[in-house]
Amino acid sequence: MVYIRRIIKEDLLLSNYYIKANRTFSTIRKYAWIFTVLVAIGGLWEPKLGLLVILIMMGLTITAFFTGRYWCGNFCPHGSLFDKVFLPISQNKKIPKFLKSKPMVIGFFIFFMFNFSRKLIKISKLWGTFSFLDKLGLLFVNTYLMVLIVGGLLAIFVNPRTWCQFCPMGSLQKLSYKLGKKLGVTKKSEKKITISSKDKCYACGKCSRVCPLQLTPYLEFSDNNQFDNINCIKCSTCVKNCPANILSLETEENAIKLKEKAFIK
């Protein structure tokens, strides 16, 4: 078994290892990409459209406090764009390690927040003027346009979810999640990828091959049979593509029950 897992891990280096598996689309996830285009393009003519992004930022921060990066895999407008529009034309390559590295993620987050805050402070001086809302909205519009262009190019030439590896909003969610976890809020509210029985796992690695973020669930299940990786966006793509049909999205309490049930059998 160890030998098989080592061989599979080495296969990650192959360019054709990753599969363009169909995503699981709810109505929101299926059409949320329209919001990105509306703000990024339409906002150039009507800057106030950018103010809607404030609601997005509030939503992802609050949901992350309870459920981790669930927003990324189920509600995110950019995620919808990458999965719905760019996936079919993506080269779907292995995401370079440096884009996933801590220095890159932390460094880009600091760089982004510094520039965003600097511009926000400058705009705040216009408070009370006629142009304040337009200038504030345009700040978010330009940000969305940047992600549309940069994230779109990375999606086409590397992998659909390349941007998500170092996305500042993803980092913000992880900070919110860590706070929620420290306060014990996530214990009952967070659902994680759960394997009903490790013994039934084929170790085929398909959960990794279809994972939008190229994570390796089959190698990282905890003692509670849950995938605890903070980067998991809980999109259920691996759940739908597991050949053994032993994966599901469960709370910790339900995961323990599933483990006990499998043990009895």
Question: What is the predicted function of each stretch?
Answer:
Residues 1-225, 230-233, 237-265:
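Non-ligating segments of multi-cofactor redox enzymes
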